[in-house]
């Protein structure tokens, strides 16, 4: 069976991506990164998703981006209730580049020629590393920088959610049997994975379920 490394954050998008990769016949190797994120319960969610969706292996890599800083997700910076103009403070500098590079390294080790990530350019928070141009550029890099690329096997970077709305992602996940109740999206999630209901991630997630006409399985700490 062909193999793929899938970035798994523990959120709803990456859970849907695993299911989509499996539907395409890939044996999934899920990679999560403990990068110093304040909402560490997403890693607990990643473990739940990996177990529930039957991945071949789930690896958690430690890369402490707090030493670099520059984000409300790693530093002592308040997470805003809503996104504003420009790139938000929840952007983690070069995060997707770093994570995809780690996934690329593991792909070489396990013999996978395909990487999957859950980046989205429709209902998203304005991060530069979620754009189609970034995904295409990273695929070029992957083929220039690896043994598989140089030897002609070719590496592909898949972003199957790139042009889907959050509602579309919910519908696809439901179609594929994804249990979104296992996932955590909130930037302020507590240790038990309960969501704040107010941050940008929570608002996008709630709107996705509402627009899809699907009951929201999110566990909230605060309702208002």
From Swiss-Prot:
Family annotation (Pfam families): QueC (PF06508)
Keyword Nucleotidyltransferase attributed: no
Binding residues annotated for ATP, in chain numbering: 8-18
Broadest EC class assigned to this enzyme: ligase
InterPro entries named among the record's database cross-references: QueC (IPR018317), Rossmann-like_a/b/a_fold (IPR014729)
Involved pathway(s): Purine metabolism; 7-cyano-7-deazaguanine biosynthesis
Protein's name in the database: 7-cyano-7-deazaguanine synthase
Organism per entry: Xanthomonas oryzae pv. oryzae (strain KACC10331 / KXO85)
